Amino acid sequence: MPPFTPVKGPMPVETSGVSLDRQISQYSTYTVKDDVVLPTGYTYDIIASWGDKVGTADHFGYNNDYLSLVETAPNEGYLVVNHEYISAKPWSQTYKQVIGVDLPLAEVKAAAMAAPDGKIDASSLLNNDPLRQKIYAISKAAQYDQGISIISVRKNANGVWERTYSRADRRITGISGLEDGRYLKSTGPATAVFKKASGQGFIDGLGDKIIGTHQNCSGGTTPWGTVLVSEENFQGEVPEPVYADGTSFPLSSLPFQWVTGEGEIEDIMGQGNALGYQGNKYGWTVEIDPVNPNDFGTKHTWLGRYRHEGYGIRAEAGKRLCVYSGCDRRSGHLYKFVSTGTVRDPKSKANSRLLEDGMLYAAKFNPDGTGRWIALKADTPVNPDLPSAHVGGMITLPKRPNGGVEKVTDDGAIAAFKDQFKTLGDLYTGNATEKQGAILIDAHFAANAAGATCTARPEDTDIAPDGSLFIAFTSGSSSSSDGSPHKEVFKAPTGESQWEYGWIMKLVETNNDPAAMTFRWEMMALGGEPADGGLGFANPDNLEIDAKGNIWMVTDMSTDKHNTEVASRIKSDGSKVSQSNLRGLYGNNSIWYIPTSGPSAGEAYMFGYGPMDCETTGPFLSKDQTTLFLAVQHPGEYHGVRENMKSEVRKFAMRTTDGKEFMQTREVPIGSNWPGKQPNDPPKPSVIAVRRINGAPLA
């Protein structure tokens, strides 16, 4: 049992402490709170919120995600905080109120709504065109609110974490370098592609200088005190596809777009269009040294370009450095970078140089629980899995000679593809370094061509004290655009063709060697309802492993599914409500504690849940294990500001842990006022420190 009384969520679970015969009476009514709800005896302090001052002239960004405390002394150090994206509805509703600046939001939104398909190619407009200038201003503000915040903090005598405002406090944003000269640097083979003076695609003329970093979702902290920051859903900001030489598709291929519609999450896409961003410079791993006020980030291209999530880092003396990461897309791969050189002292900052040379591998999972690593290099054979091996019956492969990708649904087409292209090098052009760079730039599609296993949205990757790797696979559903997981590896417990609710996998390298080329794997936790064998959560996302090996996990259900009414599990036409829409049963995104050893191993205990429309992200434990830092992202994303404490009563067709159906009446706040929690307060993404009131370790 955990050292806390689990929080009661909306769904009966085996670990709730409510006996089977009392579940219907105990769960027939439920009230959701617009707050961070924690067990009795725990509290939280707000450290920083969107709009707070950073340095002399900057402000804390939007949608904080991964965070890391790099301690420079006991209970003192730097918080490195990612800012993933902006949530268009609450961001545009409250920007002037919070930031104090007027943006031409209404005019541009109206223009986008009136444009064909809601899209405007601002890059094709004249520089002095008023519409282009307005789109530029909004895109610049949105990109500024992404990136990274570095703030100094310490725990005071009362046990409360507070900011100390050091000279190293700073922002690295999506527009760093655009006007201030603070370009990001790069290492590795893709730099040779960035330096091309001419090529098949768009070239920004900046060579290896890179403007900014954006879509910064998850990350990882190195033993030597730097932070690896991911660039995830860059494909919504800049063109993802590339040509065979690794150069980018034109700016016009991803116009500016203001997405809005019934049942949709409002979004502002194509922000790189007006700003002139070269697509192949985004989707990388950025290394930051928080204590160096002059460090504005380095993109290490040997780690590949894809929709990066968290990093599992193994740095052991006398061994090669190993960095794991997942590509968070439906059909995304698990990757491993292995350095050419070896680690001498895991705490030496010289280890950053090891990220500049090595090899990137993608995982091949076998259904029998074994697997191997496939090198993404020019002489690797082309050998993709068949489309029919996947849940959705489709795989995406590099398209030649046109560039970009093509969807393949016919098993017979794979043989023809292999006949035409024998190795990965046949799919890309340039000298040896440029060709390797192009493979890394196109990592996901190169990995598909090489036969790496398409998986179920791999999000966080974390290393346990014994060297085991834990991976959160968020969702096993298919996508008509991206693809889907391998159906013999990612199986639904109910016999259905796909499983939306996710898994947590444990992977052990052969001989526990970070550089091993083979491994074993097993699923150790399953999302879903208890009656189906699940643990009561949906869509596991970020992981944090404590000193005892226990997993702290947060969920990432799509905001539009939170508390969506499920009055019946059968639709009016007699068909079943989809797994995706059943996620309304699970309430808000939540926080869980999962022991990995002892009598409670593999059980999941709810530690809490977040405010309305939010995702609780970036769990990070202080070295003394007394503080859990969390980033509360996008409160109010779907409904915006909660007006006059509005709420609705909704019906949910719930099930007990043994499958008996009953109806739950649930009161649901509409929108959010967190963290202020006063009527009509603007919802603001914020970083919090969770602690026990008595100051003891969390668990």
Regions found by a protein language model. Name each.
Residues P2-A699:
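Conserved small-residue
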